[in-house]
Amino acid sequence: MASYGMGDLKKGLKIEIDGIPFKIVEYQHVKPGKGPAFVRIKIKSFIDGKVLEKTFHAGDKCESPNLEEKQMQYLYDDGENCQFMDTQTYEQVAISDEDVGEAKKWMLDGTMVDVLFHNGKAIGVEVPQVMELKIIETAPNFKGDTQGSNKKPATLETGAVVQIPFHVLEGEIIRVDTVRGEYIERANK
């Protein structure tokens, strides 16, 4: 396993603390007026989803987790679990809706995702950062609604709701940032 020092930490990095795998969701390098610099991070547990705040000083180390990522296809949700299939071996894995978490609102049947395994147990899902999804419901446009900074809510085919510019219409396919939950642009289709 690789070992990470204070200088190696960054947003998105997966680390292990006390045997629990985490993902760094926020990173801040602090240089106080007195004393040595340090790094303050917010980490989210892959096991229970809790977010913790940790401080790392020069010389502090943490390990890389024993995580395996496998690309799998989302099949369906049976009400309690989401079902995924390895497209190479056709092996199916059930992951609880709770462990899938926020990723669920971006997945359509057939979506390829990265399933995370910790010590052989499926613990989470990561969807692609940018996805193309169809708008199924939004407010109609009115005369004078042009490209501007005004936004309106739109429901996507997965059920997720994002804010879109007024000039984007129902039925259009848009690109969405799944990490921030934001509209990026219209898809070129």
UniProtKB/Swiss-Prot annotation:
Its main location: cytoplasm. It comes from Campylobacter lari (strain RM2100 / D67 / ATCC BAA-1060). Gene3D superfamilies: 2.30.30.30, Nucleic acid-binding proteins (2.40.50.140). It comes from the Bacteria. GO terms for biological process: peptide biosynthetic process. InterPro entries: Elong-fact-P_C, NA-bd_OB-fold, Rib_uL2_dom2, Transl_elong_fac_P/YeiP, Transl_elong_KOW-like, Transl_elong_P/YeiP_cen, Transl_elongation_fac_P, Translation_prot_SH3-like_sf. It is found in: Cytoplasm. Pfam families: EFP, EFP_N, Elong-fact-P_C. This is Elongation factor P.
